[in-house]
From Swiss-Prot:
<comment type="similarity">
    <text>Belongs to the BPI/LBP/Plunc superfamily. BPI/LBP (TC 1.C.40) family.</text>
</comment>
<feature type="glycosylation site" description="N-linked (GlcNAc...) asparagine">
    <location>
        <position position="79"/>
    </location>
</feature>
<feature type="glycosylation site" description="N-linked (GlcNAc...) asparagine">
    <location>
        <position position="341"/>
    </location>
</feature>
<dbReference type="InterPro" id="IPR017943">
    <property type="entry name" value="Bactericidal_perm-incr_a/b_dom"/>
</dbReference>
<feature type="glycosylation site" description="N-linked (GlcNAc...) asparagine">
    <location>
        <position position="242"/>
    </location>
</feature>
<keyword id="KW-0732">Signal</keyword>
<dbReference type="GO" id="GO:0005615">
    <property type="term" value="C:extracellular space"/>
</dbReference>
<dbReference type="InterPro" id="IPR001124">
    <property type="entry name" value="Lipid-bd_serum_glycop_C"/>
</dbReference>
<dbReference type="InterPro" id="IPR045897">
    <property type="entry name" value="BPI/LBP_pln"/>
</dbReference>
<dbReference type="InterPro" id="IPR017942">
    <property type="entry name" value="Lipid-bd_serum_glycop_N"/>
</dbReference>
<dbReference type="GO" id="GO:0000325">
    <property type="term" value="C:plant-type vacuole"/>
</dbReference>
<dbReference type="GO" id="GO:1903409">
    <property type="term" value="P:reactive oxygen species biosynthetic process"/>
</dbReference>
<feature type="glycosylation site" description="N-linked (GlcNAc...) asparagine">
    <location>
        <position position="231"/>
    </location>
</feature>
<dbReference type="InterPro" id="IPR030675">
    <property type="entry name" value="BPI/LBP"/>
</dbReference>
<dbReference type="Pfam" id="PF02886">
    <property type="entry name" value="LBP_BPI_CETP_C"/>
</dbReference>
<dbReference type="GO" id="GO:0010468">
    <property type="term" value="P:regulation of gene expression"/>
</dbReference>
<feature type="signal peptide">
    <location>
        <begin position="1"/>
        <end position="24"/>
    </location>
</feature>
Amino acid sequence: MDVGRCFLFLLLPSFFFLPSQTQSTDSFTSVLVSQNGLDFVKNLLVNKAIASIIPLQIPRIEKSMKIPFLGGIDVVVSNLTIYELDVASSYVKLGETGVVIVASGTTCNLSMNWHYSYSTWLPPIEISDQGIASVQVQGMEIGLSLGLKSDEGGLKLSLSECGCHVEDITIELEGGASWFYQGMVNAFKDQIGSSVESTIAKKLTEGVSDLDSFLQSLPKEIPVDDNADLNVTFTSDPILRNSSITFEIDGLFTKGETNQVLKSFFKKSVSLVICPGNSKMLGISVDEAVFNSAAALYYNADFVQWVVDKIPEQSLLNTARWRFIIPQLYKKYPNQDMNLNISLSSPPLVKISEQYVGANVNADLVINVLDANQVIPVACISLMIRGSGALRVMGNNLGGSVSLEDFSMSLKWSNIGNLHLHLLQPIVWTVIQTVFVPYANDHLEKGFPLPIMHGFTLQNAEIICSESEITVCSDVAYLDSSQQPQWL
C-alpha cells in the first residue's frame, strides 16, 4: 500500500461507505474526528507510509561530458534505492476544502552503484572503474493536500497539491579509486535530489488515484443481519473546522432485500457532536430516528410476535390457576392448558433525552385455551409498556438492554365476559418480565455496527445522552490484519 492510499485509509473512518441507490437529504448520524484523532491518524500514517514505500527504487542517472586532454567521460549511477526513511516531525492541518499533511525534517538513506569510464585519444585507450556509494538526504519536506467533496452520496477524493523538497545530500563512495572520483560524483547531487523528489511525488499521486478508484468498489451499506442494513450515504460535504472534520451520514435502517429506505423520520435539529474537552479521538452522534427506523423495519417485517407456552412458573398456563382471577374462564374451560400470544400493535417508539433513554411499546396480549387440537382465543388485552434503556459499546457495535418501568392495560375484546384487569396485573407483569424483556434483550445486546473504518476499533468509549440523540466519544486503536474481524 503506497503513501496516498495509506493516508485516506487512516484519516477517514467513514470512508467505509459508498452511496446506496436512494438517499435522504437529512443526516441522522454524524462522525467527528477531533484534533487528537487527526494526530493519531497522522502518526499512524507516517509509519504506514514509510513501511509501504521502503525500499523505493530511483531511476538510474547517466551523465556524459568531455574534458580537454582526457576525452569523453561517462558516469552512471544505478540501483539507487531508498532503504531507510526517518521523519523528525509532522503535522496535519485542515483547510476550507480539504486536508493537508506535511512531514518535515525528514532524512533518508540510499544505496547506489556507480560506474565511471573515459577514453583518451592519446594514447587511444579506455579506462573504467566502479563501486558502491552511500547517500544521505537531509532536510527533506513532503506535503500532500487532498480535497474532499460529497458526490452523489459518496465522497470524491481529489489531489490538490503534492510535493517533495530535498534540502541537502551527502554522497560517500566505496570501492575502486573512489577517493579519486568523489568530486566528480558529487556533481550528481542535484540530479539525485531531483530524482528522489519526483519519485516520491509520483508515488503520492498514484496512491491517491488508486484510493479514489478503490472507494468506488466498497460496499454500499453495512449489514446488520439477514433482514436489515444501515444506509450510510453521505448527505453533505465534510464539515472542516480548525481542529476537527465532521461527516454527515444518513444512518437509517434499510430493508436489505429491496434496499428500501424508511423515509418517515425527520431530524429535529442540526447535530453537534460534542465530547467533553475534545479529549477523545472520535465522536459519533446517533439520532433517535435511527433506533426508530430499526423498530419500524422489524415491525413491518413481522418479527414482533411471540407465542408464550413455557414460563418459569408453568402453572400460570393452566386455567386452574386463573379460577379466582377469571372464574368464567375456569368454568368454561376447566383444567385446560393455555398459551399467550403477544404481538406489537405499532412500532416501538424510542425517546432520548439528557436524563433518560426509554421506549414505549404498544402490544396485544391474546389469551388462548388449548382444547384438544384447537387453539381457542378467549380474550385480548391491549398493553402499553414503558421501558428504560441502558446503552453500551461492544467492540464497534452500539447495543444495550431494556428494563420494565411500568405498563397499563385495557380490554380489547372478550369471549368470556368482563375481566377484572387489576387482578390480572401480577400475571401480566410476570410474563413481561420473564418472557418479553429477556427476548428483547437477547436482540438488543447484539447491537448494530457504528460507522468505523475497516481496520480500526473503538477503545475506552463513553456514551453521552442529549436531547433526541446519543453521542459515542471514543479513542481508536488500529488492528493489524491478523486481529481484524473477517467480516470487515
